[in-house]
């Protein structure tokens, strides 16, 4: 009801003169909105302001209610009645004492005829009542309640509509903007699958490590001639030429993967490549950890593999006009012409007889350039071209396997048409306007097992970061608002309830109060859409009624705002995905009826006055809610009826289909390509829409409001709430019940269609568990992830030692905003659903965004398998995988060490495929990352466990990584790693010295005669009387230092000080020989002029000084520079040499001369070039994993990668 003018402490004996003051003609009146039912009250407001009465002094108990009342008769005249002294006395007696600071407020506000008449709707002013009436009839004829609504109601309406004014930002008018933004974001979030390279397919550079020296004049002149004319030699011509690992050094085209393995030649240290993990913080810059060598080699090889995930792109072929290869088709390298000589070394003719010339003279001309295959087929460029050029076998193997991965993801365009039609619920017509070509590659497919694995990873990632689930709901909510024809129009509600008349003597206006409570909390206009979006992710996100929206549990049912809140909670409850929502709304009313209708709760520590929001576990559901028959209908009739109402009318879930069987299904706990839905649903009418009154939502709204009408008219209310207020409340509820809203129709027919289509294209597929509703034992209490194979651990999915529990991140929603959406949904009267959705859904299928989820699922599988393998290979016992690197040393990793390895693999994949967001992040953030397998399960309150085992499918990248690991063990010298052990033996010589390729038998071996093994601590035993100290051997027996000793590397690390002080001097003296058992180690080479004397001791002493228990530096070796002609050499003293041959990275020496007179003598090995020089070579074969060949046949591809709208035409089906 409208609040009348009020005064504080009005005198009961006011002077008559005070009530007869007439304002001057045309005196201005207040500009504030009128607050009374009579037009002349505007003048009264002005006089009230002059009297000094402020709004805080007015209210239901103020004297204003006992002031002379006014009314308007049929003729428009003012009737004035004097105030009764008795009424004034009662008012003063019931009013709390207050101190009035302004003496003017003690005056009686004069009530007189107004100088103008104000419209209650628009505040327009008129000089006569007839003019005002004409204005109302003409300008506000469509406002049904204009003449009935009071100014207070109009003010409440304006405030309500102002609060909801922001809803226009959710209007579908900006749908194209939202769709474009989402689709662009979805495409940007996709992995970078396509990286093409038109350069050379090689990761190893032939480098002149030591430049040529002491060349003859003829050779000097020839070298100058080539340099002068910028002629690139096909092969290096230095004194020492080595094969150096340097990925993508000859690439041309797209940018790389962001990961490169570029090792320096062995003359420089490369320890940085072997300290990626388990090294930071305690390993010096110049050291590596031999006990973590396997894990670091794994990570280095993974980066090597990922950096080469490219497609060998074909380029322009031209005819070669040189003499030897005349007529051969060779490629042109636009932008890097120097690659031409390197690509086809067999074309070169060297005029001087050198090692390179001898090798190139054996080249087979038919092994150069394109092989016999048509470049054009039917007028179209062929999908692939086979050619022979510089190409190392390992890089080729990686790239060919990656092409196989992309081909396994290829989606045939004819299938894409079917996929689009099924995903769009046949609301679109799609056709293929172009001819199908073999060059088309559409890597958009993922199997169901890949999608299911990705869903488990989503659960793992979100369980460690619940905030990550909320953007999924926001994104789908935005898409829903962009495609839906449903518009929320709050004026529907205001027009309905303002037809209800209110008495002007009511101290509380029910209409104003309900409009105040229905204002959106925190401007959350999208609560309704968030609820719908959360249904698709109810396994990750649970929408719950906001705690602020619950009535205060200390209030009673007679507190009308609390009763309204209870009504709104009940109406909005089924829209949430909270399985405890029914009991919460029941307890909200039970809180208000705690005194008149007590019921048993039956849970220790829980009472009927316990806040309803705390009933969020099936174990605390009241017995009366579970079985309404337990509530005595005489003692608690309303609660009994309320429980029965919830049991009878709470909507039951249903399901519908979505997606396409050709796209696979990511569902874990729901049948494939099905979505569960919390309301009953019906097919979409394709031609017409109309309000429905028999749907589940219509029934819920109608029966809920009918129940609360019963509450309003119950004995508990009639005793304290006056009849006028109850009549108004009943009228308001009846009006709300009769509102013609389209929301129930939308929920039953249109929303399932929207969710079905949008769920098919979102980046993150729906993650759902069944809606359990009112069955206590079926309520899901936990959704869990297990990291072991269920076949090994039957209870894995519910074992808290192996799992992390998370049943959805809570997303509070405002019930008031949901109620407004339920009552105020509108659509165009002439809406044709199929036509609308055809236009709305078409943009969704105009880009590749719908396939982003599939691409990410494949990368998730590849990353997971590689991460699991990397961790397992660093364990002594764990998941069974092939272990090619088992010979490398590695301590058994702990959970923390495994997490570091997992992080490194995860970061490598995210960098290589340019991925944002989480990939495998959650696996390393909690629990034990030493994974055997993944399974997901949910636990129900009744004890039932539903478990889904999700083993990953075969991984192409992992298979390639295993081949790379096997090749590393055979060709580790190319990565600056040596095998075998280190001898420290004094060797003085003037002759040749080749420490990396010993030719003689080893001086001694473990277990040989008189060979001792040092004890585990390398302890020294001093002796008296000038006797030499002794070493404790592995039998704990002191032995003389002189002789042959075996030092395990870990013993050397912990006793390096003893070694330097006692053992090393004996080695330099030639009295002791030491075998350091390293197994595998990083090394460096130091080349020197053999004509200058050299003592290797200072270099080794520097190396020994940097050894500590945490790590060792690269082992240094000294090698004389190979000489072209005989020379007089100086005497040199060497100590260090390897026990095995480690010279595989040596490509050639003195390649620009015919021979080497002194030093290492190596010519170009034909074994690395069978494709060029071996007549028995079979095209397409290689020597992996035993040897990396440098010249091979390969396919170069002419793929095209169309977008979805580039191969298909989409239009509305109507």
From Swiss-Prot:
GO cellular component, one term: T=2 icosahedral viral capsid
Protein family per UniProt: Belongs to the turreted BTV-fold inner capsid family.
Biased composition (Polar residues): 8-18
SMART domains assigned: ZnF_C2H2 (SM00355)
Zinc finger (C2H2-type): 117-140
Residue stretches of biased makeup (Low complexity): 28-51
A molecular-function term among this protein's GO annotations: RNA helicase activity
One of the protein's GO biological processes: 7-methylguanosine mRNA capping
Subcellular location: Virion
Natural source organism: Aquareovirus C (isolate Golden shiner/USA/GSRV/1977) (AQRV-C)
Protein name: Inner capsid protein VP3
Record text on subunit structure and interactions: Homodecamer; each decamer is made up of two conformers of VP2, called VP2A and VP2B. 12 homodecamers assemble to form an icosahedral capsid. Interacts with VP6.
Encoding gene, per UniProt annotation: S3
Chain intervals for the UniProt region annotation (Disordered): 1-80
Keyword list, A-Z: ATP-binding, Capsid protein, Helicase, Hydrolase, Inner capsid protein, Metal-binding, mRNA capping, mRNA processing, Nucleotide-binding, T=2 icosahedral capsid protein, Virion, Zinc, Zinc-finger
Function: Inner capsid protein that self-assembles to form an icosahedral capsid with a T=2 symmetry, which consists of 120 copies of VP2, with channels at each of its five-fold vertices. This capsid constitutes the innermost concentric layer of the viral mature particle.
Predominant location category: virion
Keyword Nucleotidyltransferase: no
Record-linked CDD domains: lambda-1
């Amino acid at each position: 009801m409208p609040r009348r003018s009020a005064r504080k402490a009005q005198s009961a004996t006011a002077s008559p003169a005070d009530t007869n003051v007439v304002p001057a003609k045309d005196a201005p009146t207040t500009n504030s909105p009128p607050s009374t039912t009579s037009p002349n009250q505007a003048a009264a407001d002005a006089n009230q302001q002059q009297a000094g009465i402020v709004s805080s002094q007015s209210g239901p108990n103020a004297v204003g209610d006992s002031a002379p009342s006014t009314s308007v008769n049929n003729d428009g005249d003012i009737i004035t009645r004097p105030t009764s002294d008795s009424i004034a006395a009662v008012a003063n007696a019931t009013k709390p004492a207050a101190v009035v600071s302004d003496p003017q407020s003690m005056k009686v506000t004069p009530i007189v005829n107004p100088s103008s008449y104000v419209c209650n709707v628009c505040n327009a002013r008129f000089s006569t009542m007839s003019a005002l009436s004409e204005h109302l009839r003409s300008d506000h004829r469509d406002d049904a309640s204009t003449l009935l609504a009071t100014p207070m109601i109009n003010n409440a309406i304006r405030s309500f509509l102002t609060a909801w004014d922001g809803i226009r930002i959710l209007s579908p008018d900006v749908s194209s903007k939202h769709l474009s933004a989402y689709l662009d974001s979805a495409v940007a979030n996709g992995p970078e699958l396509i990286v093409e390279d038109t350069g050379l397919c090689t990761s190893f550079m032939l480098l002149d490590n030591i430049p040529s020296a002491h060349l003859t004049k003829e050779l000097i002149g020839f070298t100058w001639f080539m340099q002068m004319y910028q002629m690139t030699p096909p092969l290096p011509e230095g004194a020492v030429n080595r094969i150096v690992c340097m990925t993508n050094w000859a690439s041309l085209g797209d940018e790389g993967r962001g990961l490169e393995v570029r090792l320096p030649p062995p003359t420089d240290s490369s320890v940085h490549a072997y300290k990626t993990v388990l090294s930071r913080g305690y390993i010096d810059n110049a050291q590596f950890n031999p006990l973590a060598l396997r894990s670091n080699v794994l990570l280095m090889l993974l980066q090597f593999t990922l950096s080469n995930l490219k497609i060998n792109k074909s380029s322009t072929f031209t005819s070669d006009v040189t003499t030897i290869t005349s007529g051969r088709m060779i490629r042109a390298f636009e932008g890097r012409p120097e690659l031409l000589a390197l690509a086809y070394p067999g074309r070169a003719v060297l005029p001087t007889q050198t090692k390179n010339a001898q090798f190139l003279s054996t080249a087979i001309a038919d092994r150069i350039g394109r092989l016999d295959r048509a470049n054009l087929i039917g007028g179209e460029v062929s999908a692939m071209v086979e050619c022979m050029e510089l190409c190392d076998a390992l890089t080729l193997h990686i790239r060919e396997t990656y092409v196989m991965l992309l081909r396994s993801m290829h989606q045939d365009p004819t299938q894409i048409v079917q996929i689009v039609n099924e995903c769009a619920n046949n609301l679109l017509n799609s056709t293929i306007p172009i001819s199908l070509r073999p060059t088309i590659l559409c890597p958009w497919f993922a199997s169901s097992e890949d999608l299911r694995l990705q869903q488990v990873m989503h659960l793992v990632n979100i369980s460690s970061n619940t905030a990550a689930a909320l953007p999924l709901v926001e994104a789908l909510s935005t898409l829903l608002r962009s495609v839906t024809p449903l518009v929320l129009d709050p004026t529907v509600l205001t027009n309905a309830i303002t037809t209800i008349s209110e008495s002007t003597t009511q101290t509380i206006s029910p209409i104003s109060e309900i409009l105040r409570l229905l204002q959106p909390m925190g401007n959350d206009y999208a609560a309704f859409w968030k609820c719908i979006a959360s249904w698709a992710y109810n396994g990750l996100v649970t929408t719950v009624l906001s705690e602020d929206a619950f009535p205060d549990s200390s209030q009673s049912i007679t507190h009308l705002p609390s009763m309204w809140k209870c009504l709104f909670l009940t109406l909005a409850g089924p829209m949430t995905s909270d399985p405890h929502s029914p009991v919460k709304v029941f307890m909200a009313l039970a809180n208000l009826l705690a005194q008149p209708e007590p019921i048993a709760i039956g849970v220790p520590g829980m009472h009927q006055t316990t806040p309803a929001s705390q009933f969020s576990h099936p174990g605390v559901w009241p017995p009366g809610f579970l079985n309404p028959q337990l509530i005595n209908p005489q003692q608690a009739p309303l609660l009994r009826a309320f429980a029965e109402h919830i049991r009878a009318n709470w909507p039951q879930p249903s399901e519908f289909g979505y997606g396409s069987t050709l796209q696979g299904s990511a569902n874990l706990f729901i049948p494939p390509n099905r979505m569960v839905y919390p309301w009953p649903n019906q097919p979409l009418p394709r031609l017409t829409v109309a309000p429905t009154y028999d749907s589940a939502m219509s029934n819920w709204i109608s029966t809920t409001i009918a129940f609360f009408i019963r509450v309003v008219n119950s004995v508990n209310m009639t005793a304290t709430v006056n009849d006028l207020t109850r009549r108004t409340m009943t009228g308001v509820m009846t009006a709300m019940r009769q509102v013609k809203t389209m929301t129930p129709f939308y929920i039953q027919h249109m929303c399932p269609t929207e969710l079905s289509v949008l769920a098919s294209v979102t980046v993150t597929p729906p993650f759902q568990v069944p809606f359990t509703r009112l069955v206590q034992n079926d309520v899901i209490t936990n959704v869990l992830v297990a990291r072991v194979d269920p076949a090994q651990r039957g209870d894995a999915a519910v074992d808290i030692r192996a799992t992390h529990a998370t049943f959805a991140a809570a997303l509070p929603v405002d019930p008031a905003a949901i109620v407004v959406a339920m009552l105020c949904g509108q659509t165009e009267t002439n809406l044709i659903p199929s036509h609308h959705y055809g236009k709305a859904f078409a943009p969704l299928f105009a880009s590749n965004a719908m396939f982003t989820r599939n691409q990410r699922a494949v990368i998730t599988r590849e990353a997971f398998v590689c991460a699991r393998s990397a961790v397992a290979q660093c364990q002594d016992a764990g998941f069974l995988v092939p272990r090619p690197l088992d010979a490398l040393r590695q301590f058994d990793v702990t959970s923390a060490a495994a997490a570091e390895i997992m992080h490194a693999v995860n970061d490598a994949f995210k960098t290589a495929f340019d991925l944002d967001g989480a990939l495998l992040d959650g696996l390393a953030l909690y629990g034990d990352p030493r994974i055997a397998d993944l399974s997901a399960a949910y636990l129900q309150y009744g004890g039932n466990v539903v478990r889904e085992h999700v083993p990953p499918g075969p991984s192409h990248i992992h298979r390639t990584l295993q081949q790379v690991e096997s090749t590393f063990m055979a060709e580790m010298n190319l990565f600056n790693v040596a095998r075998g052990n280190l001898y420290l033996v004094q060797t003085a010589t003037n002759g040749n010295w080749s420490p990396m390729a010993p030719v003689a038998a080893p001086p001694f071996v473990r277990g040989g005669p008189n060979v001792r093994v040092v004890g585990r601590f390398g302890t020294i035993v001093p002796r008296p009387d000038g006797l030499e100290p002794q070493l404790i051997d592995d039998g704990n027996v002191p032995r003389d230092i002189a002789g042959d000793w075996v030092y395990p590397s870990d013993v050397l690390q912990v006793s390096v000080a003893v070694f330097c002080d006692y053992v090393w001097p004996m080695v330099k003296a030639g009295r002791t020989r030491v075998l350091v058992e390293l197994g595998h180690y990083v090394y460096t080479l130091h080349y020197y002029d053999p004509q200058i004397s050299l003592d290797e001791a200072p270099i080794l002493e520097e190396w020994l000084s940097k050894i500590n228990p945490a790590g060792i530096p690269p082992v240094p070796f000294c090698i004389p520079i190979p000489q072209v002609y005989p020379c007089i050499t100086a005497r040199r003293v060497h100590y260090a040499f390897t026990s095995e041959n480690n010279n595989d990275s040596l490509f050639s020496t003195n390649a620009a001369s015919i021979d080497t007179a002194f030093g290492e003598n190596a010519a170009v090995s034909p074994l690395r070039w069978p494709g060029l020089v071996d007549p028995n070579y079979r095209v397409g074969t290689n020597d992996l994993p035993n040897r990396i060949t440098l010249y091979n046949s390969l396919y170069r591809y002419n793929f095209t990668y169309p977008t979805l709208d580039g191969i298909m035409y989409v239009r509305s089906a109507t």
